Amino acid sequence: LLAEWVKGGGALIMAGGYLSFQGFEAKARFAGTAVEEVLPVTCFTHDDRAETPEGAVPQINDAKHAVLAGVPATMPVLLGYNRVQLKPGATLIASVNGDPLIAATQVGKGRSLVWTSDIGPHWCPEPFVKWEGFAPLMANMITWVAGK
C-alpha cells in the first residue's frame, strides 16, 4: 500500500536507527520489502549498524541539491548510521565513511529520501541537533519529497 501511494505521487522519508533499514540484529527487516522497493537505497540482509563513537564527518556529494539549500557546507560529526547501498539512478546527496547518508529518488509520480543516521539524540548527537544547519536540512528534506 505504501509503495503504491509513493509511486502515485506520495512522499516517503526513512530515517535511520536501531530498528530502521535492517537495524539491530537485522530485526527491522526492510530488505526485500515494498518499502525498500521505493527507497533510493537497498538494505543489507544483516545487521547494518555502523557505530562511530569517535565521530564520523559527513561529506557533501551534491552541494547543488535542493535538500542542501541554505545548509552550511560543513556538518558536525555523527556517531553512527545504517549502512545501505545506493540504487542505480538515485542521487547521493551526502555520505559518511563512503556510505549514503542522504539519498533521494523519484519513484513514479512520487519521491523518496533517506537519512541513514537517526534524528537524535543517539547517533545524531546534541552538537549536530543544535547545529545551525539541522533545522533547515530537515525542513528541506520534507519540502523536497513533498515536491515543493
Q: Which residue ranges define each predicted feature?
A:
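A glycine-centered loop/beta-turn motif at secondary-structure junctions
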Residues: L1-G17, F30, A34-V35, R83-K148
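An acidic, glycine-rich "communication" segment
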Residues: A11-D99, A104
